[in-house]
Amino acid sequence: MRISKISRKTKETDIQLEINLDGKGTADVSTGIGFFDHMLSSFARHAEFDLKVRAEGDLYVDEHHLIEDTGIVLGKALAEALGDMAGIARFGEARIPMDEALAEVALDVGGRSYLVMKADFIAPQVGQFSTQLVKHFFETVASNAKITIHASVYGDNDHHKIEALFKAFAYAMKRAVKIEGKEVKSTKGTL
């Protein structure tokens, strides 16, 4: 089974995360940031990954450390659950609308970390979630999962734009990690 359980404890955060890439899309998420819980739950549901997250942090400072460290742990868990990546489709893409917003994500689960994101937000925050942390979260996931992500979104409502991005990421990941055979999808023979 493609499962991972990762913990990370620092002076700023304490995070436990479990993921099953062959799950049913169940989510049990508690970070103390309602909008972030909603985004992670949406990601799990639409990727059809089972995801459990327990995260505490120095929210009295701000949400940066908690969101960043959750991205670190999620990225590491994705990498661990994928193992040697033999048989996976490797590439995934999705276009997801949410009312007036449209998000596009294309990714390569190929062992190389990179993020290109085109996203502008109007408000500084959605709930307790700083909109400037959207890009940083995806950078952190990409870096730790060793995946390349190209993402873009447009629209008028920041909630819709961010949610469409998380859902597009979910569908792209679902497609990229799908088992299609036994071989590694690389001319090098390894990822």
Curated annotation (Swiss-Prot):
Cellular component, GO, one term: cytoplasm
Taxonomy, superkingdom: Archaea
Keywords: Amino-acid biosynthesis, Cytoplasm, Histidine biosynthesis, Lyase
A GO term for molecular function: imidazoleglycerol-phosphate dehydratase activity
This protein's record includes keyword Amino-acid biosynthesis: yes
Keyword Amino-acid biosynthesis (UniProt): yes
Localisation: Cytoplasm
Stretch forming the signal peptide: none
Pfam families (alphabetical): IGPD
Catalytic activity: D-erythro-1-(imidazol-4-yl)glycerol 3-phosphate = 3-(imidazol-4-yl)-2-oxopropyl phosphate + H2O
Any single GO BP term: L-histidine biosynthetic process
E.C. number(s) listed in UniProt: 4.2.1.19
InterPro entries the UniProt entry points to: IGPD_sf, ImidazoleglycerolP_deHydtase, ImidazoleglycerP_deHydtase_CS, Ribosomal_Su5_D2-typ_SF
NCBIfam families, per database record: PRK00951.2-1, PRK00951.2-4
Family note: Belongs to the imidazoleglycerol-phosphate dehydratase family.
Protein name: Imidazoleglycerol-phosphate dehydratase
Organism, scientific name: Methanosarcina mazei (strain ATCC BAA-159 / DSM 3647 / Goe1 / Go1 / JCM 11833 / OCM 88) (Methanosarcina frisia)
